[in-house]
């Protein structure tokens, strides 16, 4: 399978050119140990500056252009751009390409934090919609087509709709229906497809955003496929999006010193998917099913299945390689289970108050070794399984403490993110004067920094929104349960930054 950029890199390496140019480590000779040995001499020799024979990502006319065209052909888009600043950069590019300052865009409330940055850059106005809440599992589903129709009825001037599909848990939205609704209102559909670069290559997975009519989709090739971390693709259809403008925006946001190892890994991952995609995804399904079957045997654990969510909560289908266990019956938080698994040298993708997510890919499928890993996971979980009656043989004080802890966990698990009120445009807050106040004293003030509990990074409150007593209480509740906070300058959340009101 042709790999235009990788092949050009290999030819350059074979020339044994002496570099009297950047980077300063000169092919690794000047790099400090132990990193030099860990990376290896071949990789370091390919950490080069922009060379005519290796093309220019800002004006591609050779191997990079060909590599991007091959990726577009594979995914069914009209243009594909290598995004070496990850899907964060690709999402920023989508928003800057599709929107003008002041334009309104429908945004799921659980959109990734990168969307906030993109909205500030684009000076666009978000109209938020809360995805359906799955109370049984304590997680959010998807935005429904009905919600999108209602949004256009209230805000007919919406220029775009943004979806996160699939979400962290592999739940795909009704992308085709929502694309049709958006297009009927002369709006474009932008999809954060970070967790779906593998979709469209096996019939047991949800269809891809491009195949469902999306106008742009940002994909994290590194999350599921074989590219290096930080490597993503931006797919664009040209019917409603100006492809030249998209290229200009990508150039604006991309470093003038892109790493060729990163770009080469995108080319290699694309070629691998083109040649072996169906086989790779079959391997991923086998590995996921082995884990699912074993986890399902553990009493009290519920492994979330496609039939639990598909056709409900705005969810069209579930990517079953995202293996999620729900711990509600155990009465233990996902944070606790995640920490215990890490002590056993098992690192998971995501934890929240009720769930633990295992991300399984084709690279996990080596039957004997994978079975050993699955056994380790299940053995650890069996040890953590709560005893049948934890209150037996306890003192009165211990019983009260356990009952209080259980009540607090139940309260946290049932809590939904409070509704917020936008008071000031995000861009105004970004450039405005700020001050720091105790979280307990923030009620009524304008938030000047995003606050998310991460993963999955769903904002509790965003810049420009007003703190309420419910938001402050929710933040305290989540922090007490051990969820790490992301966004504020003070990650202990004792204080928050607010807009100075003059």
Name every feature range the model reports, one short phrase each.
Residues 1-62, 455-456:
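N-terminal "arm"/small-domain region of PLP-dependent enzymes with the aminotransferase-like
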Residues 44-86:
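Conserved N-terminal alpha-helix of the aminotransferase class I/II PLP-enzyme fold
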Residues 167, 329, 362-366:
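A generic structural motif
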Residues 209, 234-243, 310, 314, ...:
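Flexible glycine/proline-rich, aromatic-decorated loop/lid segments
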Residues 288-289, 307-324:
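Conserved glycine-rich beta-strand-loop-beta hairpin in the small C-terminal domain of fold type I
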Residues 325-332:
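Short, surface-exposed ligand-recognition loops at beta-strand->loop->(often short) alpha-helix junctions
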Residues 340-343, 349-502:
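PLP-dependent enzyme catalytic core of the Aspartate aminotransferase-like
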């Amino acid at each position: 399978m042709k790999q235009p950029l990788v092949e050009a890199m290999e030819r350059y390496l074979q020339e044994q050119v002496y570099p009297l140019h950047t980077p300063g480590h000169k092919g690794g000779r000047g790099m400090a140990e132990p990193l030099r040995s860990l990376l290896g001499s071949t990789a370091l020799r390919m950490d080069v500056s922009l060379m005519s024979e290796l093309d220019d990502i800002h004006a591609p006319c050779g191997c990079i252009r060909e590599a991007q065209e091959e990726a577009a052909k594979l995914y069914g888009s009209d243009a594909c751009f290598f995004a070496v600043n990850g899907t964060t950069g690709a999402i920023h590019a989508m928003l800057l390409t599709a929107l003008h300052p002041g334009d309104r865009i429908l945004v799921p409330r659980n959109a990734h934090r990168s969307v906030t940055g993109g909205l500030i850059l684009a000076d666009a106005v978000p109209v938020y919609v809360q995805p359906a809440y799955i109370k049984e599992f304590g997680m959010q589903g998807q935005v429904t087509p009905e919600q999108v129709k209602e949004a256009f009825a209230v805000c007919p001037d919406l220029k775009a709709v943004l979806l996160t599909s699939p979400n962290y848990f592999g739940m795909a939205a009704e992308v085709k229906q929502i694309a049709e609704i958006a297009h009927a209102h002369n709006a474009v559909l932008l999809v954060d497809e970070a967790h779906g670069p593998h979709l469209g290559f096996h019939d047991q997975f949800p269809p891809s955003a491009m195949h469902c009519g999306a106008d742009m989709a940002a994909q994290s090739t590194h999350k599921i496929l074989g590219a290096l971390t930080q490597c993503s693709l931006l797919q664009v259809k040209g019917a409603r999006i100006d492809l030249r403008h998209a290229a200009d925006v990508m150039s604006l946001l991309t470093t003038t010193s892109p790493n060729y190892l990163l770009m080469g890994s995108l080319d290699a991952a694309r070629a691998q998917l083109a040649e072996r995609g169906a086989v790779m995804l079959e391997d991923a399904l086998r590995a996921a099913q082995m884990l699912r079957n074993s986890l399902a045997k553990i009493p009290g654990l519920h492994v979330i299945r496609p039939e639990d969510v598909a056709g409900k909560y705005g969810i069209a289908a579930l990517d079953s390689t995202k293996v999620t266990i729900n711990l509600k019956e155990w009465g233990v938080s996902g944070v606790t289970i995640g920490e215990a698994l890490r002590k056993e040298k098992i690192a998971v993708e995501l934890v929240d108050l009720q769930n633990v997510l295992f991300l399984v890919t084709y690279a996990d499928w080596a039957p004997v070794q994978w079975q050993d890993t699955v056994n380790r996971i299940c053995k650890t979980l069996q040890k953590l399984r709560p005893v049948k009656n934890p209150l037996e043989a306890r003192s009165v004080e211990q019983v009260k403490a356990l009952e209080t802890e259980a009540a607090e966990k139940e309260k946290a698990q049932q809590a939904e993110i409070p509704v917020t009120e936008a008071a000031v445009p995000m861009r105004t807050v970004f450039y405005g004067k700020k001050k720091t106040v105790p979280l307990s004293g923030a009620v009524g003030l304008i938030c000047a920094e995003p606050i998310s509990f991460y993963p999955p990074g769903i904002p509790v409150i965003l810049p420009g929104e007003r703190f309420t007593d419910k938001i402050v209480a929710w933040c305290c509740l989540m922090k007490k349960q051990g969820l790490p906070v992301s966004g504020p300058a003070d990650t202990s959340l004792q204080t928050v930054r607010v807009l100075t009101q003059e």
